[in-house]
Amino acid sequence: MTDSSRWVNRPVQLGLVGNLENRRIRDFCSRWQALGQPTPTLIDYQDLPESTPRVDVLRIDSPGENVALATQLIELGGGPKKAPLEHGEVAYLREFHLGFCALLERIRAWGLPAFNAPDEIAVMFDKWQSHQRFVSAGVSRPPASLAPASFVEWQQQRADHGRIFLKPLHGSSGSGVCALRWTRTQQQLQSPLRIVGGRLFNSLHVQKYETWAQIEFILARLLPQGMIEETWIPKLSLPDGAVDVRVLVIAGAARHHVVRQSRSPMTNLHLGNRRADSNGLDAPLEAAFRLAEQAAACFGNSLYAGVDVLLDQRGRVYIGEINAFGDLLPGLISHDEDAYTAIARAHLGI
């Protein structure tokens, strides 16, 4: 976000970078034009121009939900050419990230202002770099460390009992996240991952794995791609399950939010979880909003970010993660504006 973000009383030619078939692109175009602005210039991730586009400002959107682009990014990031990646498969996460960072660098080289700066998007896409930035700024986070790069090494150093989250360094929407607890006699890993034909796939439901053989199968494939090991913070529990909150921070202020509730450790709504009633949560929500604003302030060149905030049983709040593309919040209204309209108006200064 730059000083060029104030364009009152003049048309602004927006460049939308993303997967052009995605509803994110379609919906933001609609909101932008509804404010009297010209039709955005669409810029496909799979066909980035070498020369600088003739636009005033860029909105860089998610690279997800496109297998063809994923294959291209994996190759660009040092992975195999035409990787045999199926829809929903969890593989080549590191290579995908490196490839996406290479595209972001090409976009940065255009020298154009952007809603969210390319270099900050890259950091938000890296859970360890984000964690370090938060800790340096004094923003509350669960204790975390880089996980070992192999299951054997992880097994050698684990205690006799424990309760942790293992999260891929590069991922979003709960992809590859594992909630793991164990004692001397029992163990359980919960994750949206499914094992199909010797490969890992995201599913729309949280699965449970209760043998070390199953757990090893999963972690032996994820740990070498990079994971962060995070203390499991027991979430605030209500009658219908535990809750956390996704907060959309726009121009420094907490705006749209959704309280997410689940009986499993993962609260992502696409996993069959529900939006919870926020009645009686005024104090923890206010604390969550202030913490989300502190987290977003660590990325001073980004107009907006989705921030997941954990609420514990004692009223304490922690940053779960930050998402440069966490603004897809259909149906949520703040001050009579949906999320995309609020972002557009914040940039235009209206």
Model feature map: region roles:
Residues 14, 57, 179, 246-249, ...:
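A short beta-strand motif that forms the metal-chelation/ATP-contact edge
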Residues 19-31, 35-148:
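Conserved N-proximal alpha/beta basic substrate-recognition cap immediately N-terminal to
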Residues 18-21, 47, 170, 233, ...:
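Short, flexible loop/turn elements at secondary-structure junctions
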Residues 10-19:
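Nucleotide-activated donor-dependent transferases that construct or modify glycoconjugates
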Residues 269-304, 311-350:
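C-terminal active-site "lid" helix and adjoining low-complexity regulatory extension at the edge
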Residues 24, 123, 173-176, 329:
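Short catalytic/ligand-binding loop motif for oxyanion handling, primarily in non-cytosolic enzymes
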Residues 32, 159-268:
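Phosphate-binding site of ATP-dependent enzymes
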Residues 140-163:
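Rossmann-like NAD(P)H-binding beta-loop-alpha module
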